[in-house]
Amino acid sequence: MEQVHHLTTRNDNFLCIPPLYHTGAKFHWMGSLVAGSKAVLLKGSKPRDILNAVSNELCTIVWLLVPWAQDILDELESGSINLQDLNLSQWRLMHIGAQPVPPSLIKRWHRFFPNHQYDTNYGLSESTGPGCVHLGINHTDKIGAIGLPGYRWQAKIVDSNFNPVPVGNVGELAVKGPGVMSCYYNDPAATAEVLKDGWLLTGDMAKQDTEHFIYLVDRKKEEKGVSR
């Protein structure tokens, strides 16, 4: 899915910074495998380490978390790092996710990287990670939204009776697609609470605008722990 969402080709080079126990890291990396392109695993997340890796390895796609992007911008704004010392012309896409993204952050980012494409997406472990909802690289006018249903995914906002809510109203985000889990291990009661006719109730409260872009509002529940 990430290969489709990011238009990844064999000429791309993906910089993976999060640890591979994170589903997002694994499945973003899988996009490179599907495309037959290069991927770089980076140990550490300091601004200079990230930018040096992009420069030295000629990375074209970088997945950042909000704190890492903020740290990079702080270093650039303070003058501690000079972009003229780095080879970053091939870097085309800044992908950011795993938490709400402030629109002000992306505006700051584009002051330093005006030619960067931007994308964010949404997912959870029960949906096999990211991609069930994503913004898309052509929708920078919708920064602040998590986006539209991803490739081969459906999404809707429902009330406590699993009925769709009107546009603009807050309800629980439900998703349906090829990555939805089969069950919680050894816990049929918990499984029945979140799986409804193939739909996964995410526990995230959200709303849609008139163009069907989805915005996260709040968290309904905490993560499910799994034990033997």
Language model regions located:
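Conserved ATP-binding/catalytic segment of the ANL
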Residues: N163-G168, E172-R228
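Conserved AMP-binding/adenylation subdomain of ANL enzymes
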Residues: M1-N13, Y21-I61, E75-L76
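Residue-level signal for inorganic ion chemistry
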Residues: G36, V54, V62-L65, F162, ...
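Active-site glycine-centered loops adjacent to acidic/histidine catalytic or metal-binding residues
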Residues: A98, G123, G147, D204, ...
